[in-house]
Curated annotation (Swiss-Prot):
Keywords: Apoptosis, Cytoplasmic vesicle, Endoplasmic reticulum, Golgi apparatus, Lipid droplet, Membrane, Phosphoprotein. It comes from the Eukaryota. Its main location: other. One of its GO terms (biological process) is very-low-density lipoprotein particle assembly. It comes from Bos taurus (Bovine). Residues 33-110 form the CIDE-N domain. SUPFAM superfamilies: CAD & PB1 domains (SSF54277). The lineage of its organism: Eukaryota, Metazoa, Chordata, Craniata, Vertebrata. Interacts with DFFA. Interacts with DFFB; inhibited by DFFB. Interacts with APOB. Interacts with PREB/SEC12; facilitating loading of SCAP-SREBP into COPII vesicles. One of its GO terms (molecular function) is molecular adaptor activity. This is Lipid transferase CIDEB.
Length: 219
């Protein structure tokens, strides 16, 4: 009882809060961020790539190779040039966010109006309004993927957006799926052959029984 009476309530509360913070930190660090799709381009918007990354640094490393860049890189939002300089800000970005990667000495510039994206070079009429805009991004999650993944994003009247992400498969997964389909096909074919053979057997037995009855019938 004397030991309990000597305990300081504030120190006890501090110890409990520290234990809770340590436990929360361990739970948070045990779950790594997932791979998410992004679209990146260079400062002139002439080259665009679809990449997947879990962290800001991973996206910069992949953009360095995909866009053939060099030196220190800066990541900004393509829409308004906001710098993505922290991992916390990067994790708040939505999937399929359009980002621009700048080399040292380069700066963000707004998109020129009247020109369609992806460098089609076709000018729209001055007073026209977009009805729908569809973007296609083909990317690989792994260099060993046989077919790339496809991301499709459609925006209608600038208000409603719809996106679809079709994941590609590697050689092992494709072979596994082909074997599974072949197994199911052969299994179905086997059941069909068994049904046909059973039907033929019943037909033959019925014919023989009819012939036997015909022989035994008195004239």
């Amino acid at each position: 009882m004397e030991y309990l009476s000597n305990l300081d309530p504030s120190s006890l509360l501090r110890s409990v809060s520290n234990m809770s913070a340590d436990l929360g930190r361990k739970v948070w660090t045990s779950a790594p961020p997932r791979q998410r799709p992004f679209r990146v381009c260079d400062n002139k918007r002439t080259t665009r790539k679809g990449l997947t990354a879990a962290t800001r640094q991973e996206l910069l490393d992949k953009a360095l190779e995909a866009l053939v860049l060099s030196g220190a890189l800066t990541l900004v939002l393509e829409e308004d040039g906001t710098t993505v300089e922290s991992e916390e800000f990067f994790q708040l970005l939505e999937d399929d966010t359009c980002l621009m990667v700048l080399e040292l000495g380069q700066s963000w510039s707004p998109r020129r109006s009247g020109v369609l994206s992806y460098g089609l070079g076709q000018e729209k009429p001055k007073h026209s309004k977009d009805i729908a805009r569809i973007t296609f991004d083909v990317y690989k999650q792994s260099p060993r993927d046989l077919f790339g993944s496809l991301n499709i994003k459609a925006t209608f009247y600038g208000l409603y957006s719809l996106s679809c992400d079709i994941q590609g498969l590697g050689p092992k997964k494709i072979l596994r799926e082909l074997l599974r389909w072949a197994s199911s096909l052969l299994q179905g074919l086997g059941h069909m052959l068994l049904g046909i053979s059973s039907t033929l057997r019943r037909a033959v037995e019925g014919t023989e029984r009819w012939q036997r009855q015909g022989r035994l019938k008195p004239y």
